[in-house]
Curated annotation (Swiss-Prot):
It is found in: Plastid, Chloroplast thylakoid membrane. Belongs to the ATPase epsilon chain family. It is a peripheral membrane protein. The gene is atpE. This is ATP synthase epsilon chain, chloroplastic. InterPro entries: ATP_synth_F1_dsu/esu (IPR001469), ATP_synth_F1_dsu/esu_N (IPR020546), ATP_synth_F1_esu_C (IPR020547), ATPsynth_dsu/esu_N (IPR036771). It comes from Jasminum nudiflorum (Winter jasmine).
Length: 133
């Protein structure tokens, strides 16, 4: 049994297809979703979306947003997203190193908050690459 998953950013459709299962990072932790899941709306955290599609797991790095689950359909609206298979591992590692350096040299509260968010995004992108099997 499957359900429809649609992952959207303001600029493009990342995913729109039938899937068997997902694991979604929300602001209150990860949730697993199978067909006939109870209807909910939830905030999506910066994190990994794991998608079970044709008996293999795929990853998408999500950069925060909202999800609506109901009637065997999930719509995920996020600020930005990248499929794990589209991310260059070397570039993701370099971005992580730059984000770590920026956090170390951040001076004001605002700079620390922005550097921390950049670090979370960089870690998420690298994790999306590294969990590809």
């Amino acid at each position: 049994m499957t359900f429809n998953l649609c992952v959207l950013t303001p600029n493009r459709i990342i995913w729109d297809s039938e899937v068997k299962e997902i694991i979604l990072s929300t602001n209150s932790g990860q949730i697993g979703v199978l067909p006939n899941h109870a209807p909910i709306a939830t905030a999506v955290d910066i994190g990994i979306l794991r998608i079970r599609f044709n008996d293999q797991w795929l990853t998408v790095a999500l950069m925060g947003g909202f999800a609506r689950i109901g009637n065997n359909e999930i719509t995920v609206l996020v600020n930005d997203a990248e499929r794990g298979s589209d991310i260059d591992p070397q570039e993701a590692q370099q971005t992580l190193e730059i984000a770590e350096a920026n956090l170390r040299k951040a001076e004001g509260k605002r700079q620390r908050i922005e550097a921390n968010l950049a670090l979370r995004r960089a870690r998420t992108r690298l994790e999306a690459v590294n969990v590809i099997s």
